[in-house]
Amino acid sequence: MENVFDYEDIQLIPAKCIVKSRSECDTSVQFGGRTFKLPVVPANMQTIIDEKLAVSLAENGYFYVMHRFEPETRIDFIKDMKARGLFSSISVGVKDEEYAFIEELTRENLTPEYITIDIAHGHSNAVINMIQHIKKHLPDSFVIAGNVGTPEAVRELENAGADATKVGIGPGKVCITKIKTGFGTGGWQLAALRWCAKAASKPIIADGGIRTHGDIAKSVRFGATMVMIGSLFAGHEESPGATIEKDGKLYKEYFGSASEYQKGEKKNVEGKKMYVEHKGAIMDTLTEMEQDLQSSISYAGGNKLDAIRNVDYVIVKNSIFNGDQY
């Protein structure tokens, strides 16, 4: 690893503008045989996504990944999405009952368009075996596997049959893996993404560490096809987290997938809970993300997302906020 850096250490360098208005810029992305409005997906976490929001995102042309923390609801969810004429995108773990679940889908003739195998340390035989199991029983499902943080892991999961890999170990705002274990991509997530993307032959999802909309453009520059985001999507009207009022202000809870709130027990805890200010409607945030990304594309000197992949950059080592708490 030569240069190690994170999002706030990088500035992208503008190229000559070719559009009259940023509204001419197209932020859409192809992923798994579908076109989505943005290269952005809300994290598959219990306080970020639920069935209702999944329907809304799919209806409006956005990608989503349903979480895996209410496993018994997944079959009905897939049936419901199919009945609505929408794509289904679910998450699975690697425990024995998940193998049985995949076989049950085959028996019921249900093929989710997307299946995300989602565990904290995705470079493992457990994930490789699950990829192969899904590919055997549901060959038409697009399999996303993760999470990983090295080129070796990306290559191995791709070779096992993964259609995309998810990169990021512990950079999230409610993830404390970096503190509890000493491992992960926290603090150098963007460099890890770049390192992994160079090894990849299939799409990569950058997962975690996004704090501003500009970080989406930076992720695209360093090889992400999709960018998974938790904290920026937490706290919306549609977010599943509980709402509380404090000093006349509204907040919503947001917790990590390996937190005790998630697990219902204090065992191998690598996540925490926080309260985020209530942010209004999620579609407004998605619109703002789109507008900001359109601006990014115009600064990149193009009118499509791919223009961002070709710009130069500088490493500024944490100075872009000049010590401001952004």
UniProtKB/Swiss-Prot annotation:
Listed InterPro entries: Aldolase_TIM (IPR013785), GMP_reductase (IPR050139), GuaC_type_2 (IPR005994), IMP_DH/GMP_Rdtase_CS (IPR015875), IMP_DH_GMPRt (IPR001093)
Q: Which family does it belong to?
A: Belongs to the IMPDH/GMPR family. GuaC type 2 subfamily.
Which SUPFAM superfamilies is this protein grouped with?
Answer: Inosine monophosphate dehydrogenase (IMPDH)
One of the GO BP terms on file: purine nucleotide metabolic process
Q: What is its EC number?
A: 1.7.1.7
Query: Which parts pass through the membrane?
Result: none
EC top class named in words = oxidoreductase
Q: Which domain of life is it from?
A: Bacteria
- Detail which positions bind NADP(+): 204-227
Task of the protein? Catalyzes the irreversible NADPH-dependent deamination of GMP to IMP. It functions in the conversion of nucleobase, nucleoside and nucleotide derivatives of G to A nucleotides, and in maintaining the intracellular balance of A and G nucleotides.
- The molecule here is called GMP reductase
Query: Which reactions does this protein catalyse?
Result: IMP + NH4(+) + NADP(+) = GMP + NADPH + 2 H(+)
Q: Which CDD domains match?
A: IMPDH (cd00381)
Q: Give the record's keywords alphabetically.
A: NADP, Oxidoreductase
Active-site feature positions: C175 (thioimidate intermediate)
**Is Membrane found in the keyword set?**
no
Which GO terms label this protein's molecular function in UniProt? GMP reductase activity
Which Pfam families does this one have?
IMPDH
GO CC aspect terms:
cytosol; GMP reductase complex
